[in-house]
Curated annotation (Swiss-Prot):
21-hydroxyprogesterone binds at residue 391. The gene is Cyp11b2. A cytochrome P450 monooxygenase that catalyzes the biosynthesis of aldosterone, the main mineralocorticoid responsible for salt and water homeostasis. Catalyzes three sequential oxidative reactions of 11-deoxycorticosterone (21-hydroxyprogesterone), namely 11-beta hydroxylation, followed by two successive oxidations at C18 yielding 18-hydroxy and then 18-oxo intermediates (that do not leave the enzyme active site during the consecutive hydroxylation reactions), and end with the formation of aldosterone. It comes from Rattus norvegicus (Rat). Belongs to the cytochrome P450 family. InterPro entries: CYP11_CYP27_families, Cyt_P450, Cyt_P450_CS, Cyt_P450_mitochondrial, Cyt_P450_sf. This is Cytochrome P450 11B2, mitochondrial. Its EC number is 1.14.15.5, 1.14.15.4. Residues 1-34 form a transit peptide.
Amino acid sequence: MGACDNDFIELHSRVTADVWLARPWQCLHRTRALGTTATLAPKTLKPFEAIPQYSRNKWLKMIQILREQGQENLHLEMHQAFQELGPIFRHSAGGAQIVSVMLPEDAEKLHQVESILPRRMHLEPWVAHRELRGLRRGVFLLNGAEWRFNRLKLNPNVLSPKAVQNFVPMVDEVARDFLEALKKKVRQNARGSLTMDVQQSLFNYTIEASNFALFGERLGLLGHDLNPGSLKFIHALHSMFKSTTQLLFLPRSLTRWTSTQVWKEHFDAWDVISEYANRCIWKVHQELRLGSSQTYSGIVAALITQGALPLDAIKANSMELTAGSVDTTAIPLVMTLFELARNPDVQQALRQETLAAEASIAANPQKAMSDLPLLRAALKETLRLYPVGGFLERILNSDLVLQNYHVPAGTLVLLYLYSMGRNPAVFPRPERYMPQRWLERKRSFQHLAFGFGVRQCLGRRLAEVEMLLLLHHMLKTFQVETLRQEDVQMAYRFVLMPSSSPVLTFRPIS
């Protein structure tokens, strides 16, 4: 891992206090706090070329990726680079210059200069599938005017308070069914408790809940006997994410020769997801034509009824919402349950809150969004420590000054959430799981797991509802326990996920 000349590291925003951290490293590391406030910036603006430069052995990296070791430690490598170089550095990739930052103040600056058409990089493996199959792209893969047109039509049906009010009862039904299925498994155990790796079960829950909210159809993923079609769909989602990771960091001109089987697996997986979305939309469309229901039956039905988007655009966005709402929701649930298991005092405080709010939420499940402030804070704390996305990205539409360096328009800027969340100048005692910190004061541009501005995550509210309602029902029903006290190591596999899922014990509350 390279470092720049010391002459370049005149970072006046750095706090020099040293702290000891036990996390997130595999052993103790002495780390510096990179602060958000410090001495005044120097008067002379520094040129882009003066930004500390990070160098990587690209050939070694390419060999690792080809051997399928991939970029699993990307978040740790970048975290170490910030420790060595300061809160901003640059590197080149494929001839393009990339600037990496990790402070809330820089996130705020990115937001301030954002236009109505914020740009992000294309996710090439996904785009390649759409182009080869002649399919439209959804908002995740679009930029420019087409992105804005789609997004403005989707927001009222996916992100608005009215949309949340509509799909909350559907998600609540699935969350209650998940708890009933879990209670049944516990009753079948002679010891009166259940010890398990819960990640796949939560993966199934998020698919079931998202599918119901999108298409108004249950898949039956919460029981023991899954139908072959559901199993095929689940396998396709896993395969799509795995192959995305394998293809993401290598040029297509190379992988078309070295990874032909991976490309085939990637396209085959997307074909299954595409066929599934086609079937669901066709059924919704036919049922609506035969007789429009007066009751809400999902996001897709609402979009079709309004006629604001053509069917192929609805399909494109449904595919992306389906794919993007699974791991990104299941993993924070896993890590929240793990942190509550090894922080029983926090778990008990959340249980008291959820029991106090039980009557209001039972009468109106949407109350979970307002009556569980500590649980919402716990989810923020989980996403601080374990941000699923790892980083946010923007292609600058105009010149910008970051950390007193000039960054020209057209530069790709990466904002590393993992490093922000572990920075003791931003979050005192960052190694501690402390949901209360989010209730003590306003934290501008510090909770960015769902992005910011007009390009924030489209499925944000759906994900929040799925997590809040499941944890609400879980906390009033089970004590969650674990023997494990050491940290769970995370791996970057397109999303940041546990390298091995923690084993948890669910014990009924008498």
